[in-house]
């Protein structure tokens, strides 16, 4: 059974039973047993033993392996895209773009490493000042289920490039994607022990996070789990912790001329990936009055016709399923709780089939809800809040513990500049979907949304630490000795 990849060999798990399911059909996609604590220990030890040789390779030698990995991804792109769709439920057109992002991450990471963490030097009067960067050592990477290939790849690629060795624990909901990805690394010639895969759920994750042999942990996932990791690593300045978490993201709509363009951008912001992107719009802030009424009516009208279906359905749907039946039922329950608090249903989010994790888009007006929960409802549920003036909209947009993404739809550049200056988020977009971000730019947020800028251009910053040196080829006395010293 090919479950875990440790020290260059595949082995069966010794922990709890695991299986991943197709979210729509509930067919078993993958099954095995998770890694127990002893296997996690073995993976960390294998990474530690592989570290000296990998770190001492030239940068060009490591780049060569990364570029071969990118070629393997291209060769297996169809199989990877199919697997991503099958395990996550996202349509094939969307899972194919994820594989493309994985390929592109290699070149971006190489560029980022050279520009942000390469070697720099400059002359001084009697020496040379040199800045170099060194890898941390052994790092754990925890991956999410919503982008099971792209997001962990955004940690793993720059970590390996910098000279680290990795122990990778993917989401227990998407183990097959992780297995296929690791096979691409093996085919690229990555030495044994440099990348180790441990599958598993909570038991495996707890063992890996607590292992004293790791020098850092790179995490993408929920704020709840990220906060627990932050508490666990408190008082451990010797460990590097990079967290990319969620958001209760606001999208503010100003009066724009093209109503349908606004509606389309809202749909792309709120409902792409069935609302399972950390940057998806969760709160839609709409001005009070006739124009705002017309926008909401048109949005509801268009959303009624959005197609929802299985990942391989033809013609292709816009939305696939959410990750699991459990997730679907939790979202329907969250909608009911908001209604009980006084919200108004504009478009009901429904689960058409009780045995499938398919949900239709939901739109709910929560303006009248006094105690709106500051939560990330990770699915196709959009909350509408009506505002009286632009300053009130900005105040409401910032009324969250999170700070990942925020956006403005407006025909006024002055409005955008005003919004940008006051917006509390790591990503601020103007007249573009909230889920859009340039891979060549930093990605991440502030507050409860995380600390470092994970899985993108600034990932190089936390994958290596700077070493400043003063250097001269020969030791010599200075021209003038300091007072009080006689030779």
From Swiss-Prot:
Enzyme active site: 244, 278
Highest classification ranks of the organism: Bacteria, Pseudomonadati, Pseudomonadota, Gammaproteobacteria, Pseudomonadales
GO biological process, one term: arginine catabolic process to glutamate
Enzyme class: oxidoreductase
A family per Pfam: Aldedh
Annotated source species: Pseudomonas putida (strain W619)
InterPro entries named among the record's database cross-references: Ald_DH/histidinol_DH, Ald_DH_C, Ald_DH_CS_CYS, Ald_DH_CS_GLU, Ald_DH_N, Aldehyde_DH_dom, SuccinylGlu_semiald_DH_AstD
Keywords, alphabetical: Arginine metabolism, NAD, Oxidoreductase
Its EC number(s): 1.2.1.71
Catalysed reaction equations from the record: N-succinyl-L-glutamate 5-semialdehyde + NAD(+) + H2O = N-succinyl-L-glutamate + NADH + 2 H(+)
Official protein name in the record: N-succinylglutamate 5-semialdehyde dehydrogenase
Gene responsible for this protein: astD
Residues given in the record as NAD(+) binding sites: 221-226
Signal peptide start and end residues: none
Pathway(s) of this molecule: Amino-acid degradation; L-arginine degradation via AST pathway; L-glutamate and succinate from L-arginine: step 4/5
MF term (GO), any: succinylglutamate-semialdehyde dehydrogenase activity
């Amino acid at each position: 059974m090919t479950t875990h990849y440790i020290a260059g060999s595949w082995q069966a798990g010794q922990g709890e039973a695991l299986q991943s399911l197709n979210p729509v059909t509930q067919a078993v996609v993958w099954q095995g047993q998770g890694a127990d604590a002893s296997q996690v220990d073995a993976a960390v030890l294998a990474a530690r033993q592989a570290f000296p040789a990998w770190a001492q390779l030239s940068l060009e030698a490591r780049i060569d392996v990364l570029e071969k990995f990118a070629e393997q991804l291209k060769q297996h792109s169809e199989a990877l895209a199919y697997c991503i769709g099958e395990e996550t439920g996202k349509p094939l057109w969307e899972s194919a773009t994820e594989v493309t992002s994985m390929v592109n991450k290699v070149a971006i990471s190489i560029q980022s490493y050279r520009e942000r963490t390469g070697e720099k030097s400059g002359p001084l009067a009697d020496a040379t000042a040199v800045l170099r960067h060194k890898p941390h050592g052994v790092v754990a990477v925890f991956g999410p289920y919503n982008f099971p290939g792209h997001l962990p790849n955004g940690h793993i690629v720059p970590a390996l490039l910098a000279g680290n060795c990795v122990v990778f624990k993917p989401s227990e909901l998407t183990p097959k994607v992780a297995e296929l990805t690791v096979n691409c690394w093996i085919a690229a010639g990555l030495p044994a022990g440099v990348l180790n895969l441990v599958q598993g759920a909570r038991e495996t994750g707890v063992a890996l996070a607590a292992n004293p042999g790791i020098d850092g942990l790179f995490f993408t996932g929920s704020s709840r789990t990220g906060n627990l990791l932050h508490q666990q690593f408190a008082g451990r300045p010797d460990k590097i912790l990079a967290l990319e978490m969620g958001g209760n993201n606001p999208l503010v709509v100003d009066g724009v001329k093209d109503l349908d363009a606004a509606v389309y951008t809202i749909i792309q912001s709120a409902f792409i990936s069935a609302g399972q992107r950390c940057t998806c719009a969760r709160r839609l802030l709409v001005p009070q009055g006739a124009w705002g009424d017309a926008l909401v009516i048109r949005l509801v009208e268009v959303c009624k016709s959005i197609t929802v279906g299985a990942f391989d359905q033809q013609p292709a749907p816009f939305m696939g399923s959410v990750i699991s039946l459990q997730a679907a039922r939790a979202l329907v329950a969250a909608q009911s709780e908001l209604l009980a608090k006084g919200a108004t249903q504009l478009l009901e989010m429904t689960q058409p089939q009780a045995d499938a994790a398919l949900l239709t888009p939901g739109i709910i007006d929560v303006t009248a809800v006094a105690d709106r929960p500051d939560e990330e409802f990770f699915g196709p549920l959009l909350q509408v809040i009506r505002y009286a003036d632009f300053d009130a909209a900005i105040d409401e947009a910032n009324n969250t513990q999170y700070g990942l993404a925020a956006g403005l739809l407006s025909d006024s550049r002055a409005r955008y500049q005003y919004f940008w200056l006051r917006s509390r988020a790591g990503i601020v977009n103007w007249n573009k979907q909230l889920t859009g971000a340039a891979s060549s730019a930093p990605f991440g947020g502030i507050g409860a949304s995380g600390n470092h800028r994970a899985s993108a251009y600034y990932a190089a910053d936390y994958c290596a630490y700077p070493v400043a040196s003063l250097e001269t080829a020969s030791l010599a006395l200075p021209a003038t000795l300091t007072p009080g010293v006689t030779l």
